[in-house]
Swiss-Prot record:
GO molecular function, one term: 3'-5'-RNA exonuclease activity
Enzyme Commission number: 2.7.7.8
Pfam families: KH_1, PNPase, RNase_PH, RNase_PH_C, S1
Assembly and interaction partners: Component of the RNA degradosome, which is a multiprotein complex involved in RNA processing and mRNA degradation.
Similarity comment text for this entry: Belongs to the polyribonucleotide nucleotidyltransferase family.
GO process terms (BP): mRNA catabolic process; RNA processing
Name under which the protein is recorded: Polyribonucleotide nucleotidyltransferase
Phylogenetic lineage: Bacteria, Pseudomonadati, Pseudomonadota, Gammaproteobacteria, Enterobacterales
Amino acid sequence: MLNPIVRKFQYGQHTVTLETGMMARQATAAVMVSMDDTAVFVTVVGQKKAKPGQDFFPLTVNYQERTYAAGRIPGSFFRREGRPSEGETLIARLIDRPVRPLFPEGFVNEVQVIATVVSVNPQVNPDIVAMIGASAALSLSGIPFNGPIGAARVGYINDQYVLNPTQDELKESKLDLVVAGTEAAVLMVESEAELLSEDTMLGAVVFGHEQQQIVIQNINDLVKEAGKPRWDWQQEAVNEALNARVAALAEARLSDAYRITDKQERYAQVDVIKSETIAALVAEDETLDENELGEILHAIEKNVVRSRVLAGEPRIDGREKDMIRGLDVRTGVLPRTHGSALFTRGETQALVTATLGTARDAQVLDELMGERTDSFLFHYNFPPYSVGETGMVGSPKRREIGHGRLAKRGVLAVMPEMDKFPYTVRVVSEITESNGSSSMASVCGASLALMDAGVPIKAAVAGIAMGLVKEGDNFVVLSDILGDEDHLGDMDFKVAGSRDGISALQMDIKIEGITKEIMQVALNQAKGARLHILGVMEQAINAPRGDISQFAPRIHTIKINPDKIKDVIGKGGSVIRALTEETGTTIEIEDDGTVKIAATDGEKAKHAIRRIEEITAEIEVGRIYNGKVTRIVDFGAFVAIGGGKEGLVHISQIADKRVEKVTDYLQMGQEVPVKVLEVDRQGRVRLSIKEATEQSQPAAAPEAPAAEQGE
């Protein structure tokens, strides 16, 4: 019946278990991977036949987190999981990126990978587990796949690399790096860091790749025991005669077209050449497949660009290999936003804004690993007009979510701590033109917009996208790649950071054989490019503005006695609601007695502070206050003495002679001097008019607690 095959191995501080043959036996392959109570069930289904006319590889990766994995019921209205969250989308991309290049060229059968998180230990992130599961399932499936891959997370604590750190360890770590690769080569890196050096980052990549070899070995052993027979798939034979005929018609013309430096002009010319070539060939032989001709033309394009770069000739737009496109940097471009910048690099342009809000604007993320609050939001929008196309405009696609997260990682390391700058900050990058490296333009624009908004970031940051063309032992690293160089090259390598170090590194490698030395050259060349861009940015704005925008809320902070919090909030929030309406401010109170008052108008903030100080003022026994009669009863009168405090003047304490009727001496609303005789344990205040009038000292207002005020 059920006959599971299991492999267990130690991976750093965790025990990993791979199990197959137990569940989902109708899928092409299925694996349950667990790492110290975090378990992910991964299935792979591949279609044996490709759809007719299919001209691209339809790989789909779905990653889904089930709340039952953490012993919870979904909080949504329907109490079930809905569309993928941003976190799920990012992990799906993390799985997709290293496995996609390992399918053979020409393989266009549909393949779907589904990773479902079924159990979660809050200390062990499921992303690495899911990547290992996808690698194992694809390797077991028999589908043409040049894997397996391994995956590792690397931390950097006390100047030491840590393999697969726990969530608690990650809080202490200066690095959060995920690396995936085959036995021979690194394929993907995704990381954020606290401005670490190039050597430290490269060391982490190499360390992670070395450590994950045990994963690859164990997957290979599992495949020997339980793997399905390899599919009998053969790449279609190359039609040499047809290739030569297409090259004769188009190669020289395409070579000339790729000397046109303007992107739109070049694309138009390339389209003309392709359509004329296909039309001429189909006229000669009607049986020819237009898709096949298109693929041959694409291969010729790729060869034209690559051979020119390898020969040391100028690039598509006429630049040398390490040249950056022309930069145009402007700040304060939108009058009413809190901070704005327009960053243009060649034909790539980002309009970036920064908006300041209060702590209640922070995003609450209800994640499988636990609830957390994010006070720095980064949103990236890529409208179709940025590449001169029409298209759907709506909720962000996977690519936009991924690029937004990368840009956020680039800026996160320089953001001020919440206790020093108590604002929620939202950065939005609108890509208005795109020809390569728009996510890195977003990093540069974000740094400028944050400075323009007066956010005290620790340093300016810039980002750069690098490319690589490699044939045999000959390789060239390209700085600031164009969109075409990204598609036609062998590596996409994005680095963001300040003058002092790297804040984010993302690598996607399409070929094997990228050595440590090549990565070192790319990182060093990226550093030079980054410093050049920072130099240009500093000419526009070299430090955060001294003050935040007049349109941004100013946050004033005062400290009150924690015992007085209930007085400021009032029954059912009545006092704080009334204060908010009366003063036109936003008031937030923390458990330690910190009160934050946010207002766009300084006078309103001062009014709110004054009112809170009145409410929280301590009443001093023996002190005389000016009061107002609020209620008259048979046995005396209640007098308000400021700050919402009220005390009783007993009938015997109204005058130094016998008082028959209170109203003979006091009227509602009458202002009278009163002396505090006693405050009992329940906070009730006894007052005396008689003793106050006997003493000649002037009346005092309630004394307020010391207030610390910052903006």
